[in-house]
């Protein structure tokens, strides 16, 4: 299994911080466009949508780390935590934009909106599930929780599916963009289901080759 080529170990930490900086650029740029009146239509809705779509992208990127390693041998595991936390930060910004700028903190209207619109109910449920994952994304929690940590963090697949569904249900007509994200999440969830069988099949397939190499 090879890791990222031509990246010295001393650059692993700086590269993760660079990922955080790059990861926040869409939010900063979107806020700038909104503040200067350059977002089309309803600026609040557009900014809210931008944050939500980037949250979903970072969730998908987080889930894609393992299949990329399994299929192509490229180890990006060191970036998975950063990608997952970026997804959480974008979900929180998406949520706060909805609460503060869209609904202006009118709690009765917010509660009614959650109850009346299923896609918002699903989005809120995904946020609630995501919070414990973000809180436990650290070495101390991994050591403290042990195997329970792995079970807890499998919820990310449910969260990603809920996020894609939230996005698809938020529009009047499901278009190619919504279908793409639903498809990507479905593929990643399916990979999770077949991963062990695939790895077992690959090990069985490479075992005779290793035996022949030793015999030769």
From Swiss-Prot:
GO cellular component: plasma membrane
UniProt superkingdom: Bacteria
Transmembrane region(s): 16-36, 48-68, 82-102, 119-139, 155-175
Molecular function, one GO term: heme binding
Record note on cofactor: Binds 1 FMN per subunit.
Purpose: Part of the MsrPQ system that repairs oxidized periplasmic proteins containing methionine sulfoxide residues (Met-O), using respiratory chain electrons. Thus protects these proteins from oxidative-stress damage caused by reactive species of oxygen and chlorine generated by the host defense mechanisms. MsrPQ is essential for the maintenance of envelope integrity under bleach stress, rescuing a wide series of structurally unrelated periplasmic proteins from methionine oxidation.
Name the record gives this protein: Protein-methionine-sulfoxide reductase heme-binding subunit MsrQ
Species annotation: Rhizobium meliloti (strain 1021) (Ensifer meliloti)
Gene it is expressed from: msrQ
